[in-house]
UniProtKB/Swiss-Prot annotation:
SUPFAM superfamilies: UBC-like (SSF54495)
Record Gene3D superfamilies: Ubiquitin Conjugating Enzyme
Primary subcellular site in the record, as a coarse category: cytoplasm
Stated name of the protein: Ubiquitin-conjugating enzyme E2 2
Keywords: ATP-binding, Chromatin regulator, Cytoplasm, DNA damage, DNA repair, Nucleotide-binding, Nucleus, Sporulation, Transcription, Transcription regulation, Transferase, Ubl conjugation pathway
Catalytic activity: S-ubiquitinyl-[E1 ubiquitin-activating enzyme]-L-cysteine + [E2 ubiquitin-conjugating enzyme]-L-cysteine = [E1 ubiquitin-activating enzyme]-L-cysteine + S-ubiquitinyl-[E2 ubiquitin-conjugating enzyme]-L-cysteine
Superkingdom of origin: Eukaryota
Active site: 88 (glycyl thioester intermediate)
Domain UBC core: 4-150
Documented EC number(s): 2.3.2.23
Amino acid sequence: MSTTARRRLMRDFKRMQQDPPQGVSASPVADNVLTWNAVIIGPAETPFEDGTFRMVLQFDEQYPNKPPAVKFVSQMFHPNVYSSGELCLDILQNRWSPTYDVAAILTSVQSLLNDPNTSSPANVEASMLYKDHRQQYEKRVRDTVEASWTD
């Protein structure tokens, strides 16, 4: 059964294959186009550099009118990531637009890694370290990067 969401996701997948954004990759799981596995490579010249962070994107039949649920599977220490791996990112909530596609979501998440929003943190400890003790924050992030190589 073909739905608008499934057709759109296949277009998103085709775009990811033909014009992949730097440092991100994603594809639907073999038997369900509504569930995607993704990987974000930590941006160069940031504490996240060389990290390989796995994520899951869960879409429903209302996509693209409703954003997917996006969750880190890899361990992540970041002001805008809950301990569950779920993200606090405006474009996945109140600033969602149907014009966003999978590539836009992943590049936004990648950008968020080095530019957190500390005004409404999901991880208060990470936010406080980021603002007040940057060296400690960066050490915790580097520990997360190393963990990303084995998880």
